Curated annotation (Swiss-Prot):
Catalyzed reaction equations: [protein]-dithiol + NAD(+) = [protein]-disulfide + NADH + H(+); [protein]-dithiol + NADP(+) = [protein]-disulfide + NADPH + H(+)
Name of protein: Thiol:disulfide interchange protein DsbD
Organism (species): Vibrio cholerae serotype O1 (strain ATCC 39315 / El Tor Inaba N16961)
Biological process according to GO: cell redox homeostasis; cytochrome complex assembly
Family recorded in the similarity comment: Belongs to the thioredoxin family. DsbD subfamily.
Pfam families linked: DsbD_N, DsbD_TM, Thioredoxin_7
Coiled coil: none
Upper classification of the organism: Bacteria, Pseudomonadati, Pseudomonadota, Gammaproteobacteria, Vibrionales
Localization in the cell: Cell inner membrane
CDD domains: DsbDgamma
Membrane topology designation: Multi-pass membrane protein
């Protein structure tokens, strides 16, 4: 397969372009009055943006959200748990793909959502706790919202309420809605339609793994074992090889399901910075094994036992061949251990059972395609072994190195994320240019590889050159406006009193890690030199409400803050400036114009 390296080099050219992320969120209450800054809000309260309803029918609780036009809910921020109550399995309709510069790719809901929740075992005081978050498309995010629903006793077998009683929850009304839950087959179709690229990518990776030096030379031997050493018709050979591959695919699919299921239980932990750093180190270790620094494989004793178990099966028979394939899926060669581990880490991160099963099944099918071809058409279809197989293995190492950058760019500044992508691109395309003369083809194909490598080097070097050629701008971006953090209402009152004594105006910025537009303010507005000069005479305060703790909620209510970003202003006399509040992102010039209009 002489065009394989061509395909992978073009694929890598796409992979090494910086990937920017999404994810935002969330909801707060609007029950307080603006004791500090009675300002008109541009955005509606959370209960108007995402009207929430729930009603219980026997042993099923139906949870419904309406979504106002111009707003959306985040799928991965919807959490449902029980208190004194066992909840059965449930699923959310697959959300729409959405991309954001700062938080990556997530799924969102822009239309009504209904979740039928099966209730299994009731205890006195049973409650269902629902958490969710959402944003406005205009760049305004709500803090996390929590709803508590009291559950009446029920009979799970008869599906009828035994002792109806009035719902005492003060947080949630329970009117019935007309939203019908999405059927299982529709949900499955939506998942497959929205993640169509995942199986194709894993299929391509499987084919690529087949051409590594630990795998390709084994295909003729493996084919002989599968066919039982007999001369068979092409139809029989095709059937046996397909059955073998299906056995291997079954093992991979089960691995995908198990790992995705485990990942689903720890999705919050998998987003923690320390966990992301740990996973990044693991991916780097896997990549280094592909570069030949060391070998990763099962312990020799385990491999010997699995091989003997596989050899005990009867080649040429359908059950025996299927069993051989299933067992072979557990025997990872040094060339496949790292990529397979990386694939399993990917599906663990996704926490999606369907994605895990389909991705690993496609990977196994990709690895099995050459085996099927050899079984049916003979060894003449296989390319000659050579150093080019080591090149394929090394290429997988660079692909694995892209994974930790995807993970780390969620927690490192954009500048360092750009540096990491540039470094990876320079290393990969530099290696590709270095080895182009040793590839198993010449002529225009070799020239094309050289052109791709040079273009990749130039593209990878561009971000670094931009920083080096504009040192003033880079230094300006690294240096951020220094805010004084306040944690509660008392600290705000003290800071306002101190600023009044100094005769200085005050700007209070509400910030949260989940707020997309807050990061836009940091990157584009607060880094601007003119904005820095304008705010040099202000007392700059910042409240980090990421955790949405009681003191954060108290502060938000006191200032009638519905969501983020929100920026408040007080003049030098310590009085709130009418109509000065900023909700939603403002670029440099509109921000400066706004301050001027408000006399600040």
């Amino acid at each position: 397969m002489r065009t394989l390296i061509l395909c992978f080099s073009l694929l890598f050219a796409l992979l090494t372009q910086p990937a920017w992320a999404i994810f935002g969120n969330n909801a707060g209450n609007n029950t307080g009055t603006a004791s500090f800054a009675p300002t008109q809000n541009r955005f509606v309260p959370v209960d108007e943006a995402f009207p929430f309803n729930a009603f219980q029918q026997g042993s099923t609780l139906f949870i419904d959200w309406q979504v106002k036009e111009g707003y959306y809910l985040y799928q991965d921020r919807i959490s449902i748990s029980g208190e004194n109550l066992e909840i059965g399995e449930y699923s959310l309709t697959e959300g729409e793909p959405y991309h954001d510069e700062f938080f990556g790719d997530v799924k969102i809901y822009t239309t009504p959502l209904s979740v039928p929740l099966p209730l299994v075992a009731y205890q006195s005081g049973a409650k269902v706790i629902v958490q969710y978050q959402g944003c406005a498309k205009a760049g305004f995010c709500y803090p996390p919202e929590t709803r508590v629903i009291d559950i009446t006793p029920f009979n799970a077998e008869s599906n009828r309420v035994i002792e109806p009683k009035t719902n005492t929850s003060t947080q949630t009304t329970l009117p019935q809605t007309d939203n019908a839950p999405t059927s299982a087959q529709d949900s499955l179709a939506n998942k497959l339609a929205q993640n169509w690229w995942t199986p194709l990518l894993f299929l391509a990776l499987g084919v690529g793994l087949a051409f590594t030096p630990c795998v390709l030379p084994m295909y003729p031997i493996l084919t002989s074992i599968v066919l039982g050493g007999a001369q068979l018709t092409q139809r029989r050979a095709l059937l046996l090889s397909v059955i073998y591959v299906q056995g291997m695919a079954l093992t991979y699919t089960l691995l995908g399901l198990v790992v995705a299921s485990a990942g689903l239980q720890f999705q919050a932990a998998l987003q923690h910075p320390y966990v992301l750093m740990g996973l990044s180190v693991l991916f780097v270790a896997l990549a280094l094994s592909m570069f030949g620094l060391y070998s990763l494989q099962l312990p020799s004793g385990v491999q010997t036992w699995l091989n003997s178990l596989s050899n005990a099966q009867q080649g040429g028979s359908l059950p025996g061949v299927f069993a051989m394939g299933a067992i072979s899926g557990l025997v990872c060669s040094p060339c496949t251990t790292a990529p397979l581990s990386g694939a399993l880490l990917y599906v663990a991160q996704s926490g999606d059972l369907l994605t895990g099963a389909v991705a690993l099944y496609a990977l196994a099918i990709g690895m099995g395609i050459p085996l099927i071809l050899v079984a049916v058409f003979g060894n003449k279809l296989l390319p000659k072994a050579g150093n080019w197989m080591e090149r394929v293995k090394t290429l997988f190492g660079f692909v694995l190195l892209a994974a930790p950058i995807f993970l780390l760019e969620r927690i490192v500044p954009e500048f360092w994320s750009s540096v990491l992508w540039s470094a990876l691109g320079l290393a990969a395309f530099g290696w590709l240019y270095h080895v182009k003369n040793s590839l198993p083809f010449g002529g225009w194909k070799q020239s094309l590889i050289g052109i791709v490598a040079i273009l990749g080097l130039l593209a990878s070097a561009q971000p670094l050159l931009n920083h080096w050629l504009a040192p003033t701008q880079t230094a300006q971006q690294v240096k951020q406006i220094q805010f004084t953090r306040i944690a509660n209402l008392s600290e705000l009152q003290s800071a306002l009193a101190e600023a009044k004594a100094q005769g200085k105006s005050v700007m209070l910025d509400f910030y949260a890690d989940w707020c997309v537009a807050c990061k836009e303010f940091e990157k584009y507005t607060f880094h601007a030199k003119q904005v820095e000069n304008k705010l040099s005479g202000f007392v700059l305060l910042q409240a980090d409400v990421t955790k949405n703790q009681p003191q954060d909620i108290e502060l938000l209510k006191a200032l009638n803050v519905l969501g983020l970003p929100t920026i408040e202003f007080w003049n030098a006399q310590g009085e709130p400036v009418p109509n000065a509040r900023i909700t939603g992102f403002m670029a440099e010039q509109p921000f400066l114009d706004h301050l001027t209009q408000q006399g600040l």
